[in-house]
Amino acid sequence: MLKVGDYVSRNSYNNDIIFVIKRIENGVCYLKGALERLVADAPLDDLKKENEVTETFEEKRPTLEEREDYFYLPGKILHIDADLDYLNKCLNYYKSVKIWAAGKCINEQEVPKQITELIKEYNPNIVVITGHDAFNKNKNTYKNSHYFIEAIKEARKYEKSHEKLIIIAGACQSDYEELIKAGANFASSPKRINIHALDPAIIASSISMSDATKEINLKEILENTKYGSEGMGGIITKGTMYMGYPR
């Protein structure tokens, strides 16, 4: 018998993604991706129990080629996430690469109302705006892309420069083109696919630890994410890390 907290996959989708059961009501299980930023529901009889989550994607962690006589100031990150579990995963990732990051768990629809004050409070170099999203092919609509777009626009009212404030926005299947048009430096999802829970954090960390005086290697940074340029895309910009002397 399946229960809340079990790992499962969906038979109707060839068991392609591992989920965690968050709740069960009237024979329907409400699911969240164990690794992908995805929420779904499925009848009990469509689910196969999985014993464990096997992560085949090994995230690449940015590293510094430090010189003993210099000190380094990576860019600061404000990570806004509608999902607390994924937020904590991302904060742990930032901690593992020794980057300063503040995290806020806020529902997608509330972010446009709060983002300006959060930017004023934390004064970040990089803002991540993420959570959950979905593309309905039949209706040609998105679950939460509108809120991401409005949040980006509000942030750009405060700081228009794409180099003074780096914005990384979107979640699974988000409206990539409109997020970029709204003012994001990076966004999901060019091919309307699901993205890994850590993908926004991987890009944010790479930008944080890239030289502020040089343009980033856009393709290389995108290749560090699980699905590459199919899941995330962006514009060429400069990094946010400064180097100083003496140490």
Question: Model-flagged regions — what are they?
Answer:
Residues N15-N26:
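Short beta-strand-centered aromatic/proline hotspots
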Residues M1-Y13:
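Short coil-to-beta transition motif at edge beta-strands of beta-rich domains
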Residues L35-L78:
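Intrinsically disordered, low-complexity, charged/polar segments
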Residues G5-V8, V28, T56-F57:
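N-terminal accessory regions of nucleic-acid-interacting proteins
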